[in-house]
From Swiss-Prot:
This is Glutamate--tRNA ligase. SUPFAM superfamilies: An anticodon-binding domain of class I aminoacyl-tRNA synthetases (SSF48163), Nucleotidylyl transferase (SSF52374). A motif ('KMSKS' region) lies at residues 248-252. It comes from Prochlorococcus marinus (strain MIT 9312). NCBIfam families: gltX_bact. The lineage of its organism: Bacteria, Bacillati, Cyanobacteriota, Cyanophyceae, Synechococcales. The keyword Ligase applies. Monomer. It is found in: Cytoplasm.
Length: 479
């Protein structure tokens, strides 16, 4: 039997990290067992669904490296098929027309609220006669189609993550609405629970992996599967992603769309790596830094936790920094080069850009950190007070003059790392100046402060961009 899993997002907003993690778990399991990962766009909410959100979801999946195996299916293309199965449920007596008005439903809910009862339809039109139906239609009433749910029934299934789950029919909110309102004997547009069952059966889905907030939907859908004599898939319900307070992660807590994570400077490999461990506790993992291929080889749905997974910026940032540190240098320089381009900064050469990328990568958590870390190499930083104070209290002006004179008199040309060390050593011996004073003075001239990246490697870059001498001269004039 071919194993088939699917992601079924609604295109009513930007690609959310919760949906992305669901996609990842489906994709990983498909990879692990040699199955297929499919996409179905559930766009039957016509008011909120937008094509740009569909594109955003598909682009986000590609960015994360989660490629699907077949052409994505649009639920809206299959409305006529959904209606055919609703008609079948009507004909076999598993569903019926309900003419309850919105006002009547509101009154019912108010009564239940006063009594402290949960909202639940009273199924008042389940046994209407043909004459009563004709009367409602002649009055111009619209009807929805409701699926009969036996309150005494117990629905149970074996969940691959949670084990046996049981649900009572009386807790499902009354008979289930399958379609929107329509006039006469028409059938309105199909709703979520019916469309999902029909489409999963049509796509031959064998495994449904989705969030725990769908558990009650699964109970309802199992009844529809059985009424239509469809084969049940295997169900797995993943834990929710939580905020620091243990509540479901929302836009109010932090950024949640994949676009935002990308724009902040997270690498797709790092975000996928982090999401995989967000609720998944593998027994055989030897490291927290694993590629998608490595993860797929050890991935088991049974290793996913039941409890909610708290989102940790600290952990995500650490993982992202590890990916930046281990990134191939040419690729890294090209990646952060896009940030330089946006700033209007032009490296003197590709070799120079690679050297700068190597120099700053250990100080980067996000890709956009390249802007602050690179800025002193493209723009003249102001001399900070701490820098001026150091130069004044340690005769830094003399140290800088000694370095400047050496560079000019010796006509040193390009200063590489070895040459930089040689210059500092020679000046220190010739003029009896501590090497630490010379290097700190030079750091102030280059960076405007006493902090910054490795000085010797930086000097090589400033020399190649022909700005080392000019920066020393600028600093001398300012003190």
């Amino acid at each position: 039997m071919e194993i088939r899993l699917r992601l079924a997002p609604s295109p009513t907003g930007l690609f959310h990290i919760g949906t992305a993690r669901t996609a990842l778990f489906n994709w990983l399991y498909a990879q692990k067992i040699g199955g297929k990962f499919l996409i179905r766009i559930e766009d039957t909410d016509f008011l909120r669904s937008k094509s740009e959100y569909t594109k955003n979801i598909l682009d986000g999946l590609k960015w994360l490296g989660l490629q699907w195996n077949e052409e994505p299916v649009k639920q809206s293309d299959r409305i006529s098929i959904h209606k055919k199965y609703i008609k079948k449920l009507l004909e076999c007596g598993a569903a019926y027309r309900c003419f309850t008005t919105e006002d009547e439903i509101s009154e019912l809910r108010e009564e239940q609220k006063k009594k402290g009862l949960p909202p639940k339809h009273d199924n008042r039109h389940r046994n209407l006669s043909k004459e009563e139906i004709e009367t409602f239609i002649s009055q111009g009433r619209t009807s929805v189609i409701r699926f009969k749910i036996d309150e005494e029934i117990q629905i149970k299934w074996i969940d691959q993550i949670r084990g046996e789950i049981k649900w009572q029919g009386k807790d499902l909110g009354g008979d289930l609405v399958l379609s929107r309102r329509a006039m006469g004997y028409e059938i309105g547009d199909p709703l979520y629970n019916l469309a999902v069952v029909v489409d999963d059966n049509f796509m031959n889905i064998t495994h449904v992996v989705r969030g725990e907030d769908h558990i009650s939907n699964t109970a309802k859908q199992i009844l529809i599967y059985e009424a239509l004599d469809f084969k049940l898939p295997t169900f797995s319900h993943t834990p929710l992603i939580l905020n620091n307070e243990g509540k479901k992660l929302s836009k109010r807590d932090c950024v949640t769309s994949i676009d935002e994570f990308r724009d902040m400077g997270y690498l797709p490999e790092a975000l996928s790596n982090y999401m995989a461990f967000l609720g998944w506790s593998p027994k055989s993992a030897t490291s927290e830094i694993l590629s998608l291929d490595e993860i797929s080889k050890i991935f088991e749905l049974s290793d996913i936790n039941k409890a909610g997974a708290k989102f940790s910026w600290e952990k995500l940032n650490w993982i992202n920094s590890q990916y930046i540190k281990n990134m191939e240098t040419v690729k890294l320089s090209e990646t952060i080069g896009k940030y330089w381009d946006n700033m209007g900064w032009d490296p003197p050469s590709q070799e120079w850009a690679i050297k700068l990328a190597i120099l700053i990568k250990d100080s980067m958590t996000l890709l956009k950190d390249a802007i602050d870390q690179s800025k002193p190499f493209f723009l003249l930083p102001p001399i900070q007070k701490e820098g001026k104070d150091f130069l004044e209290s340690n005769d830094g002006k003399t140290s800088l003059k000694l370095i400047l004179n050496y560079l000019i008199e010796q006509n040193t040309g390009k200063v590489d790392k070895d040459k930089a060390k040689e210059i500092i050593n020679e000046i220190s011996k010739m003029h009896n100046v501590k090497k630490g004073i010379l290097m700190k003075s030079l750091r102030v001239a280059f960076f405007g402060s006493l902090s910054g990246p490795d000085l010797i490697q930086s000097w090589e870059l400033f020399s190649e961009s022909k700005s080392d001498i000019s920066r020393i001269e600028r600093c001398l004039k300012s003190i």
